[in-house]
Structures are given as structure tokens and as C-alpha cells.
Regions:
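HhH-family (HhH-GPD) DNA N-glycosylase catalytic core used in base-excision repair
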Residues: 1-149
């Protein structure tokens, strides 16, 4: 959610500060953040302090947890959209799949999860292999995922 409207470089340069501020990204910890914690985060100059994005991170963590409970894991939720198949696409920054997942996550209550951000996430976790067929890494992404909890 923090990347929305910013460069990936900006967010990645703050990765360790985010890890510290968000308790190592432990889901239950982030889900429990309250108003006092959000206020403290707004004072932390080492992270992105946009109030709406901070609130979204907590809300999104809670929705993420709900999806885990509903589907067994967030991985199962994502791979359910492709019946466990890796999609090979090269070039776009969004797709009908990222449109659908973005819409579903928004319907569930997440924010700052637009189709471009979801598309990038799907690439990062291996649901979409966006390597050009001539790229030396094109074959490195497995055709079938290894299920993870």
C-alpha cells in the first residue's frame, strides 16, 4: 500500500525502517496496531508517514488475516485465481487477473491495492512470469507452484 504514487526505489530504500516500525511484519502484531501506534508511526521520519497509508496497512493486514482464515493461506487465495498455473505475460503493467484480484481485495476492505500494484505483486510471488522469452531468467520460474501455507 505504501508504494501507491511513489517509486519502488523510494519504498525499497526504507525497507529496513519499515521492518522495524512494523514489528518485523508480524501479521498479528500489525493487526493489533491501535491509534497510539499509528500516531507514533506518523512521527517516525524513517518511514512513509502518510496517515491514510498507515491506516491502510493495518486494515489490509486484518483483511489479509481474514483471507488466510477463509482460504487456508493467502497463497491458496492467489493461486485459486489461476487454478495453480503460472501465467506467462510480457509487457503489460496490469491484466484482467490483476483487475479482478484488485477489485476483490477492495470489496473485502483493502485500500491502495490498485491493479498495477497487484500485477507487480503477482510477478513478485511468481503467479505471473513476466520475463521476455529471450531473457535468461524466463525459464527460472516454475510452471507449477510449490504450495505454501
Amino acid at each position: 500500500s505504501f508504494q501507491a504514487g511513489l517509486s519502488w526505489e523510494c519504498v525499497l530504500n526504507k525497507r529496513e525502517a519499515f521492518r522495524r516500525a512494523f514489528d518485523g511484519f508480524r501479521l498479528e502484531s500489525v493487526c493489533a496496531f491501535d491509534e497510539a501506534k499509528l500516531h507514533a508511526l506518523q512521527q517516525d521520519a524513517s518511514i512513509i508517514r502518510n496517515r491514510r497509508k498507515l491506516e491502510a496497512a493495518v486494515r489490509n493486514a486484518r483483511v489479509f488475516r481474514d483471507i488466510q482464515q477463509e482460504c487456508g493461506s493467502f497463497s491458496s487465495y492467489l493461486w485459486g485465481w489461476t487454478n495453480g498455473q503460472v501465467l506467462r505475460e510480457f509487457g503489460p503493467t496490469s491484466s484482467p487477473l490483476s483487475d479482478a484480484i484488485s477489485a476483490d481485495l477492495k470489496k473485502r476492505g483493502m485500500t491502495f491495492v490498485g491493479t498495477t500494484i497487484i500485477y507487480a505483486y503477482l510477478q513478485a510471488v511468481g503467479v505471473i512470469n513476466a520475463h521476455s522469452p529471450t531473457c535468461y531468467r524466463a525459464g527460472a520460474v516454475p510452471l507449477y507452484p510449490t504450495p505454501r501455507p
